């Protein structure tokens, strides 16, 4: 699918507790959010994406754990039907979660027709070191 000239809105970054306060999220639209609340110091970046069918996908480079699902359910509107990735793609000692988010958005933009898990299989490896190299290479190329 060619999306070179397609506009997909992306809102400002928000904290997890501000997601529910967002006005209507368009189809498609990206929201980068931090898993900390607005008065916290910030903890980890993730992406909320509303796909063309209106379903929501959450990409988290460290994987959505049961603890994170509980946190997200607390802050996401009850009407959201959400698909999460539970697979970890980023090393635990890495601080590049924001870079992973932007890399995911870039890849998703050119593959809007792919479901979350399909896309993740094509862009990431089970080898976390290779994923780190891929994300860093993406930035070194000037994206």
Language-model region placement:
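Cysteine protease-like catalytic core of ubiquitin/ubiquitin-like
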Residues: 27-110
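Alpha-helix initiation/capping motif
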Residues: 9-18, 34, 66-73, 124-125, ...
């Amino acid at each position: 699918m060619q999306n070179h000239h397609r506009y997909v809105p992306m809102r400002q970054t928000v904290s997890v507790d501000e997601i529910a306060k967002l006005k209507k999220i368009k189809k498609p639209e990206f929201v980068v959010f931090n898993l900390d609340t607005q008065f916290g110091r910030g903890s980890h970046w993730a992406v909320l994406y509303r796909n063309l069918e209106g379903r929501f996908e959450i990409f988290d480079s460290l994987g959505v754990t049961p603890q994170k699902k509980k946190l997200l359910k607390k802050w996401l509107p009850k009407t959201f039907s959400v698909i999460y990735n539970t697979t970890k793609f980023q090393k635990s000692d890495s601080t590049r979660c924001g870079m992973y988010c932007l890399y995911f958005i870039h890849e998703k933009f050119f593959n809007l027709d792919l479901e979350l898990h399909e896309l993740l299989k094509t862009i990431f490896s089970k080898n976390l070191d290779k994923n780190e190299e891929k994300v860093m290479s993406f930035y070194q190329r000037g994206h």
